[in-house]
From Swiss-Prot:
It is an enzyme of class 2 (transferase). Pathway: Lipid metabolism; phospholipid metabolism. Pfam families: FA_synthesis. Homodimer. Probably interacts with PlsY. Its EC number is 2.3.1.274. Belongs to the PlsX family. This is Phosphate acyltransferase. GO terms for molecular function: phosphate:acyl-[acyl carrier protein] acyltransferase activity. Keywords: Cytoplasm, Lipid biosynthesis, Lipid metabolism, Phospholipid biosynthesis, Phospholipid metabolism, Transferase.
Length: 334
């Protein structure tokens, strides 16, 4: 497998990206990595960190898409950027997957303009896994589509079902629609119309509406919503996790007795923190694009990049792209 990596994307690029590549190649010596970015910087980093070097190819790219760049404009104007060149390689079949911690908007715009969408998909969507009491659930969409139609919500659920069952190994995953109440008639027009489509769909295990307050305790395997709501849920979850541990730190420092208690609880709190750590999840696939694209967190370190590359590998090895095409084609013929 040949995996493309955007070396210039993310707050900690290119150092964290090269660290992630080095970790990955230590465990996956049969795969090849193609790195896109400033060759002079990348070569210096790779010589120090990456072995074996013969499994590495560097494609020199002189431009970089910044987080503040307007996505579509950047894709059209920065032709020699690591994202544009990497996606072009993906389109031409020179790599099997592309991983980036760069601009989400640019990745989505580039995926649509360069790689293209799966036939029958109205809008691709971005997913992520979020923690709850007993594990993780998949949230879709988390920011790609702030305005949606009911057909978009249905297709998000269909794509997520294939991904969760084939990559994450959850048979017949449950699907819930994020709403302001559990009753069937709750919500705005989008929610009500989406509910009817989801309820009548034969290829998903729809369990009804789900409220936000149940997400930390007993969510379905997949929670579907528009990207505006999904991004708020994502950012709030990240923020609450940080707040929780900041409060614990303050309490642990409040007295000598609290410090002793904190030391005793430290290994257990470390395990708890791991559940909220995006580094372990790695990345979020862009479902609906006609190619494997994995978006890593903008603040990714080497471990997060390593996990993101593994996400791309699992997507590829489980033939998820072909399965998504089959699913959408079958549904459109009904």
């Amino acid at each position: 497998m040949r995996i493309g990596i955007d070396a210039m994307g993310g707050d900690n690029a290119p150092h964290a990206v090269i660290e992630g590549v080095a970790l990955y190649l230590k465990e996956n010596r049969d795969d090849e990595i193609v790195i896109f970015g400033d060759k002079n910087i990348i070569e210096e980093e790779c010589v120090q960190k990456v072995q074996p070097l013969d499994k590495l190819e560097i494609i020199d790219c002189k431009e970089k898409i910044e987080f503040e760049d307007e996505p579509v404009k950047a894709i059209r104007q920065k032709k020699d950027s690591s994202i544009v060149v990497g996606l072009q390689y993906l389109k031409e079949g020179k790599i099997d997957a592309f991983v980036s911690a760069g601009s989400t908007g640019a990745l989505m715009a580039g995926g649509l303009l360069i790689v293209g969408r799966i036939k029958g998909i109205d809008r691709p969507a971005l997913t992520t896994r979020l923690p709850y009491k007993d594990g993780q659930y998949l949230l879709i969409d988390v920011g790609s589509n702030t305005d949606c139609r009911p057909i978009n919500i249905l297709q998000f659920a269909q794509m997520a079902t294939v991904y969760v069952s084939k990559v994450l190994g959850k048979k017949n995953p449950t699907v819930g629609l994020l709403n302001i109440g559990t009753e069937e008639n709750k919500g705005n027009d989008l929610s009500k119309q989406s509910y009817e489509l989801l309820k009548s769909a034969k290829n998903i295990n729809f369990v009804g509406n789900v409220e936000a307050r149940s997400l930390p305790f007993s969510p379905p395997d997949i929670v579907v919503c528009d990207g505006f709501v999904g991004n708020i849920v994502l950012k709030l979850t990240e923020g609450m996790g940080l707040l929780f541990f900041d409060i614990l730190k303050d309490i642990a420092k409040s007295s000598f007795r609290a410090q002793i208690g904190g030391l005793l609880l430290k290994p257990y709190l470390k395990r708890l923190k791991g559940k909220y750590d995006y580094k372990e999840v790695g990345g979020a696939p862009l479902l609906g694009i006609d190619g494997i694209i994995v978006k890593c967190h903008g603040s990714s370190d080497g471990q997060a990049i390593f996990s993101g590359i593994h996400q791309a590998k699992a997507f590829y090895e489980n033939n998820v792209l072909a399965l998504l095409k089959e699913e959408i084609t079958a549904e459109s013929e009904v």
